[in-house]
């Protein structure tokens, strides 16, 4: 990957395997909550040891090169940022397939990554919402606008739909709440939560705020 070569040259990195394996780990965990400790442990279990300080530098280099975007977690009820665990999203998901192959196709995380990057493109700051023991995929903020978003591949089953909508229904403020999924239908409203087809949302065909 040319980006890794540029990072190696810019920061004069000698141990290129550490950088490459750090990149692979993050690409393989797009949309998962990770920490420096969990990444270090995962790499160590795979036979590669490095300090958390070195790892932090590599992660910062990857983000500074705009290959990855770090998204922090936000406690919705407590209205504060959480210090442990972040998510990382890839500027272009094709980089993941080019680096790791296409055997592991997780469309839920693919769609989540697409929505994250599109929100950033539209000028939103995004956070992962934590509400009690539930998770909101995105809290998106732009000036005085705020919206809570869940992203899913398929919500046709009652169990999956309930899993996605229940955290949104627990939020007590009046900001918009939306589920973006592969529905292939017109937008619907469920107890104040908009359910929007991801293709229509990406094309900007829906009024979702």
Can you annotate each of these PLM segments?
Residues 92-94, 130, 152, 181-183, ...:
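Residues at the C-termini of beta-strands that transition into short coil/loop
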Residues 136, 157-160, 185-190:
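Short active-site-adjacent structural elements
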Residues 146-156, 164:
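Active-site ExK catalytic segment of metal-dependent nucleases
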Residues 89, 149, 178-180, 194-196:
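Hydrophobic/aromatic beta-strand patches that form the interior of the parallel beta-sheet core
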Residues 119, 137, 149, 168, ...:
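Hydrophobic, well-ordered secondary-structure elements that form the walls
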Residues 1-146:
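Accessory nucleic acid-recognition modules appended to NTPase machines
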Residues 131, 172-193:
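Nucleic-acid nuclease catalytic cores
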Residues 184-209:
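Domain-level recognition of nuclease-like catalytic cores that cleave nucleotide substrates
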């Amino acid at each position: 990957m040319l980006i890794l070569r540029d990072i190696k040259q810019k920061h004069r990195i000698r141990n290129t395997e550490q950088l490459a394996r750090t990149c692979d780990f993050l690409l393989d965990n797009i949309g998962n909550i990770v920490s420096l400790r969990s990444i270090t442990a995962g790499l160590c279990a795979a036979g590669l040891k490095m300090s958390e300080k070195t790892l932090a530098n590599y992660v910062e280099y990857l983000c500074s090169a705009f290959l990855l975007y770090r998204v922090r977690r936000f406690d919705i009820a407590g209205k504060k940022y959480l210090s442990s665990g972040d998510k990382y999203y890839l500027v272009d998901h094709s980089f993941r397939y080019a680096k790791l192959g296409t055997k592991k196709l997780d469309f839920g995380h693919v769609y989540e990554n697409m929505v994250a990057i599109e929100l950033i493109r539209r000028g939103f700051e995004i956070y992962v919402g934590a509400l009690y023991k539930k998770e909101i995929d995105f809290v998106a903020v732009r000036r005085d606008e705020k919206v809570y978003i869940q992203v899913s591949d398929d919500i046709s089953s009652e169990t999956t739909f309930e899993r996605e909508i229940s955290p949104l229904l627990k939020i007590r403020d009046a900001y918009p709440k939306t589920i973006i999924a592969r529905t292939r239908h017109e937008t619907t409203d469920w107890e104040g939560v908009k359910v929007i087809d991801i293709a229509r949302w990406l094309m900007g065909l829906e009024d979702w705020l």
